[in-house]
């Protein structure tokens, strides 16, 4: 096998392959990428056995063939090579890589392609299209709420379904929940799916901002295509919780605060917060939100910022990361917390049941947060 390629075009694709590959052992075939040179293009395949990736790069082929090489070393060679043409030559198990712009050559050992796991074709699958921007926004607003508790494996991915002509993505770790709805476009019916975080992260990082992407959910797998890229993943097997029961209804009160003010105040007051607890107290009164970091081994802090609220004095304790994570992706100037007030013993008003955090005006996503005890 012998071909030449453009270094910059190749490095973009190999960097994506590296995201897929988790086994870094040079003796494991899963540490390799499969290269297939034919029809003046190079097909590149990578997998960790669960997530699979296929892409195509234009190359000039002198001799067709296929092989596998250690992805990590190939990426290091590309990273240290100058832009321009690079020659790739395979003879038996030896691969020679020669950048045209430098008097240097590298030699790698290859493994035969018949040892590489089969990555099947997605032809004839029932793909539907969705705006890439919409799907990426669905991921952005849910991925941080996915649980990392392996004992509750059915919550270690984002739930994706079609209902009432809408596409919905939901994630929860049991203490917070994020939900996004988008138009279903021309999507056909499919079985609701729990999508692993890894493929969602790859799509979020690599899908374009403009145009559409194609999605198919079939046979306990999801397939995603855009540009010259195709990703697929085995879905998480399990029963996702009934998320609709978690979303509170009939909330009668709200506080609105400037997003930038809240973000900056949280960054300051959480400097001394106990990171094992991550608790911040919100004390809300007419026109004023006071953020309090309770006294810890590091110290204490509080800060007042203006807000729009004209009800009784109330308070609630929240895990501050459950607030800062949505703040990173909410784009509106102001954010709103919707809630109901509970009267506790002693007459002090507090919020102890689920709170909805959202944009203002309301968008197609919500973030549900359970208050903490304090």
Predicted regions and their residues:
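Structural preference for solvent-exposed beta-strand-turn elements
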Residues: 1-374
């Amino acid at each position: 096998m012998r071909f030449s390629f453009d270094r910059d075009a190749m490095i973009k694709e190999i960097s994506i392959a590296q995201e897929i590959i988790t086994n870094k052992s040079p003796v494991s075939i899963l540490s390799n990428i499969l290269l297939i040179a034919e029809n003046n293009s190079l097909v590149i395949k990578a997998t960790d056995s669960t997530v699979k990736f296929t892409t195509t790069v234009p190359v000039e082929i002198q001799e067709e063939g296929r092989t596998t090489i250690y992805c990590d070393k190939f990426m290091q060679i590309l990273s240290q090579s100058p832009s321009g043409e690079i020659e790739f030559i395979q003879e038996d198990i030896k691969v020679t890589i020669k950048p045209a712009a430098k008097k240097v050559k590298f030699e790698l050992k290859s493994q035969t392609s018949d040892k590489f796991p089969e990555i099947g074709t997605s032809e004839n699958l029932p793909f539907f299209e969705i705006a890439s921007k919409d799907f990426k926004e669905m991921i952005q607003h849910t991925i941080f709420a996915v649980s990392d508790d392996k004992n509750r494996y059915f919550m270690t991915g984002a739930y994706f379904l079609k209902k009432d002509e809408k596409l919905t993505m939901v994630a929860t770790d049991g203490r917070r929940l994020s939900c996004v709805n988008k138009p279903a476009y021309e999507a056909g019916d499919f079985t609701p799916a729990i999508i692993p975080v890894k493929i969602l992260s790859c799509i979020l990082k690599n899908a374009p901002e403009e145009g559409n992407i194609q999605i198919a959910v079939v046979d306990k797998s999801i397939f995603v295509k855009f540009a010259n890229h195709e990703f697929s993943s085995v879905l998480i097997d399990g029963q996702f919780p009934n998320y609709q029961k978690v979303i509170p209804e009939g909330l009668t009160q709200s506080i609105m605060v400037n997003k930038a003010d809240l973000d900056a105040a949280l960054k300051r007051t959480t400097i001394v917060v106990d990171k094992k607890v991550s608790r911040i107290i919100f004390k809300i009164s007419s026109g004023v939100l006071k953020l309090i970091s309770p006294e810890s081994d590091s110290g204490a802090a509080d800060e007042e910022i203006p807000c729009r609220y004209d009800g009784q004095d109330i308070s609630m304790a929240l895990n501050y990361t459950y607030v800062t994570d949505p703040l990173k992706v909410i784009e509106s100037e102001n954010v709103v917390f919707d809630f109901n007030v509970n009267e506790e013993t002693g007459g002090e008003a507090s919020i102890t049941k689920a709170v909805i955090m959202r944009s203002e005006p309301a968008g197609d996503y919500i973030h549900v947060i359970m208050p903490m005890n304090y």
